[in-house]
């Protein structure tokens, strides 16, 4: 696992974890905007990006690696932790491991209720079509379609370049393991109730039902949680494609005890 850092190390620490199949650049734009007030840390998970040759193991394994980094580099505590999809689940696991790890947490589009059937279907699809779906040609088509159909969500050139470099080299094995662990096995732990963090749990209005159910379960077990539904949006849109909207939502949450109504 590699850690990219932005801002002065003396600033409060914020760690943001990318989604499955993507890499640290998921949160690059947010990191730059936050770095005038915060020390922002963006990990590259094993099996992703420049760490594509390392085996991805599980949510729990990733959380333990990040916990070691926090102990060694941040005096064992963060101001805030966040993540999108798989990254959000890893953030949830960090909160479950240590009730004092962070004052704030931002979860976007993550599940914490096992979905074994969905995991099996996704695994079959990625085993059959993964090499085609993540080929350089397919990635180019995806980027050009994004520009034409959703110009407000298109990546800038810098992130397009990272996308074109990292997506085609993501091992199919990484994706299969993510579906099996993130989707098929991970269950919210009872220790989450002990977490002292104030949590903002975001999901898109058009997300799968299991994401919305996960947010409800999380809030039930950890009442210091505001659930925010991003109207008209699908999975992870604010974190991955709309950094300015993410900042508009998250900045007040970081700076105050402002609660957003869903």
Annotate each language-model stretch with its function:
Residues 208-214:
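Conserved alpha/beta-hydrolase "acid-adjacent" motif
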Residues 195, 201-203:
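Short beta-strand/loop motif that positions the catalytic acidic residue
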Residues 116-118, 136-191:
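Conserved alpha/beta-hydrolase catalytic His-Asp/Glu region
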Residues 96, 102-133:
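Flexible "cap/lid" loop of the alpha/beta hydrolase fold
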Residues 233-244:
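Catalytic histidine-centered segment of alpha/beta-hydrolase-like enzymes
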Residues 5-52:
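Conserved HGGG/HGGXW glycine-rich cap/lid loop of the alpha/beta-hydrolase fold
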């Amino acid at each position: 696992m590699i850690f990219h850092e932005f801002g002065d190390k003396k600033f409060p620490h914020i760690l943001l974890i990318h989604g499955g199949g993507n890499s640290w650049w998921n949160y690059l734009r947010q990191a730059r905007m936050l770095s005038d007030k915060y020390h922002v840390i963006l990990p590259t998970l094993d099996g992703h990006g420049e760490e594509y040759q390392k085996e991805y193991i599980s949510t729990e394994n990733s959380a333990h690696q990040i916990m070691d980094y926090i102990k060694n580099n941040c005096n064992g505590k963060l101001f805030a932790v966040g993540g999108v999809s798989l990254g959000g689940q890893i953030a949830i696991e960090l909160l479950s491991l240590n009730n004092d790890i962070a004052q704030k947490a931002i979860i976007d589009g993550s599940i914490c209720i096992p979905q074994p059937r969905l995991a099996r279907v996704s695994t079959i699809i990625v085993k059959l079509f993964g090499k085609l779906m993540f080929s350089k040609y397919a990635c180019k088509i995806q980027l050009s379609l994004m520009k034409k159909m959703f110009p407000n969500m298109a990546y800038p050139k810098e992130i397009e370049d990272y996308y074109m470099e990292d997506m085609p080299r993501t091992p199919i094995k990484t994706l299969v393991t993510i579906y099996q662990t993130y989707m098929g096995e991970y269950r919210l732990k009872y220790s989450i109730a002990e977490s002292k963090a104030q949590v903002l749990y975001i999901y898109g209005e058009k997300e799968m039902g299991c994401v919305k159910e996960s947010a409800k379960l999380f809030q039930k077990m950890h009442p210091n949680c505001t659930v925010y539904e991003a109207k008209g949006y699908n999975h992870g849109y604010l974190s991955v494609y709309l950094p300015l909207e993410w900042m508009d939502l998250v900045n007040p949450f970081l700076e105050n005890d402002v609660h957003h109504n869903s």
